[in-house]
Amino acid sequence: MDNSILYVNACVRKASRTERLAKKLLERLGAPFEEIRLEELEFPGVNEAYLQRRDQLLSSGEHQDALFDLARQFSRAETVVIAAPYWDLSFPAALKQYLEQITVVGITFRYSEGGVPVSLCRAKRLFYVTTAGGLYVPEEFGFGYVKALAQGYFGIPDVKKIEADGLDLYGADAEAIMTSAEEALACIRPIADAQPGAEPFSLIPALMTAADIGEKNE
């Protein structure tokens, strides 16, 4: 589907603030989306038998096997939105399992003769949406990991983090912080306006933070 959005939802709470912010982003993008709720998936256990089967399927070129359904789905998306709350310096474990499932040679990337990953994905934009109760949110284990994988393997040039933090600090007005984060989405280009060549993509991803917007977001 043209202008398709893949929405990868790693949230688990019914009143998830991350999910709330992600839904506002989807409204802003203004295109149909397909949602994956990671809590509803049963990821296979990674053991020797699983790895042997996976390697056998890949070596024989059986990329249509159900084991690679998630990878094929990801490779077809033109825009990706990942909603992942900030947990323990990173993100929920289910997201790591998902990323392992979609990182498949011959589907989402291939290796060049020099051993360099080359993208097989269609996506040009990926949004990583997250919220945090505190302010100490180092990005290298969460967004930084997703960014490196998205750009280095999947060839997605435009990777942005959309966040709201400090929500649970003493005296914080969580609703005001959320509202500011939602209002800041006005600077995101809707899908209909994001035509190829309309805006140059940098290999260094843009990072949408409170510093860029002038207010604290989550």
Question: In which residue ranges do the predicted regions lie?
Answer:
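Glycine-rich phosphate/pyrophosphate-binding loop and the adjoining helix
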Residues: 137, 144-218
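Conserved nucleotide-sugar donor-interacting segment of glycosyltransferase catalytic cores
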Residues: 104-114
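Short histidine/acidic/glycine/proline-rich micro-motifs that form metal-
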Residues: 11-14, 133-137, 167-168
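N-terminal beta1-alpha1-beta2 submodule of the flavodoxin-like/Rossmannoid cofactor-binding fold
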Residues: 1-104, 183-218
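Short, glycine-/small-residue-rich phosphate/pyrophosphate-handling segment
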Residues: 112-154
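Hydrophobic residues at beta-strand termini and immediately following loops
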Residues: 36, 129, 162
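Short, well-ordered alpha-helical segments in soluble proteins
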Residues: 99-102, 106, 130, 154
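Short acidic/glycine-rich loop or secondary-structure boundary segments that cap or lie
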Residues: 44, 90-91, 136-138, 170
